[in-house]
Design a protein with these regions (language model features):
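A conserved acidic beta->alpha catalytic loop
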Residues: 45-54, 74, 104-105
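Glycine-rich, basic loop-to-helix element that forms the pyrophosphate-binding segment
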Residues: 71-92
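A short, conserved alpha-helix in the catalytic core of glycosyltransferases
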Residues: 175, 181-186, 191-218
């Protein structure tokens, strides 16, 4: 626990994971150079082919803050990037690690506002708002203790107590994690590649008794990701259907593993039934049904290599 007003300030290291989005990375790195309180910025480049590695090699600082880049030999997805980046930050003697993707842009006061809520938290982050419509959340929040899902920034701020909502965090979009928590629960599951690694890390943290929260006065701006769910079962629920075979394969595999490990066999079975219903009735597709079955079998068997066939 770090008191911001008394005692030594924590050593805060920002970790950015990037893949082939150099214009967005340039903007984000410039913004991080304007934020006081950062000791260092580390960028993990997932073997980008757009000149990211060369760009990083030419930049030892952003503003007054030391900047280091590390280009991985192969693209290991967000999961591999955050696994390596978090380990790197801890190796660089970080007390707090600020984790983010390359497509978010924290407000200049975002870190300050997060640090006002340092006491008694292990894993906490900002609201992630639509850059084109800052009154809307990019990732809707299900409020604790009920089924209500909120999409509007005003609604989530009204639901907050003392500027925060305990029990909710949206990793890895500008979240802070303490060294103590990393020492306790380890690193993100790199084998997930993409999809669900952030959710799994939050579930693992909660299972270990971590105190998580969203600070509603802190903001990261992020491009809209569109509608995250397609209505199904006569509008009773939604299904996360991606046009990308890679994303769908990882979602089906990793989500089943997360449900089995953290929610139990009934929740896992419900997801299997939901997937079968969606690709049989809602959006019929035999090929997508087969892909889902293969992904789920792989997850149950602990085989996390199947997604590689979708990588060019």
């Amino acid at each position: 626990v770090y008191a911001v007003t008394t005692g030594p300030l924590p050593r805060i290291v920002a970790v950015v994971v990037t893949f082939n989005r150099l214009p967005l990375l340039e903007k984000l790195v410039a913004r991080l150079g304007e934020i006081e309180g950062l000791a260092e910025v580390l960028v993990v480049d997932n073997a980008s082919s757009d000149g990211t590695g060369e760009w990083l090699a030419d930049r030892p600082t952003t503003g007054e803050i030391p900047l280091s880049g590390r280009t991985l030999s192969t693209n290991r997805g967000g999961a591999g990037g955050f696994h390596d980046g978090l380990a790197w930050a801890i190796d660089r003697e970080a007390d707090l690690v600020w984790l983010m993707d390359d497509d978010g842009l924290p407000d200049v006061d975002c870190l300050d506002r997060l640090l006002l809520e340092t006491d008694n938290l292990d894993f906490w982050g900002p609201l992630v708002v639509d850059e084109a419509d800052p009154d809307r959340l990019v990732f809707p929040i299900r409020l604790p203790g009920g089924t209500r899902v909120v999409h509007a920034v005003g609604d989530v701020r009204r639901a907050a107590s003392h500027d925060r909502i305990d029990g909710i965090v949206i990793p890895f979009n500008g979240v802070l994690v303490t060294k103590e928590l990393v020492d306790r629960i380890g690193l993100p599951r790199e084998e997930f590649f993409i999809w669900g690694d952030d959710h799994e890390y939050r579930l693992r943290a909660e299972e270990a008794g971590a105190r998580v929260a969203t600070v509603v006065t802190a903001t990261v701006r992020h491009p809209s990701v569109g509608n995250l769910g397609t209505p199904m079962m006569f509008g009773r629920t939604t299904y996360n259907d991606s046009p990308s075979d890679l994303k769908h394969y990882c979602m089906a595999r990793n989500n089943l593993v997360n449900l089995r490990d953290y929610r139990g066999p009934l929740h896992a079975l419900a997801f299997v039934v939901k997937t079968a219903w969606f690709y049989t009735f809602t959006r019929p597709s035999l090929s997508r049904l087969r892909l889902s079955v293969g992904a789920m079998r792989a997850g149950i068997a602990g085989d996390f290599d199947g997604h590689r066939r979708f990588l060019s």
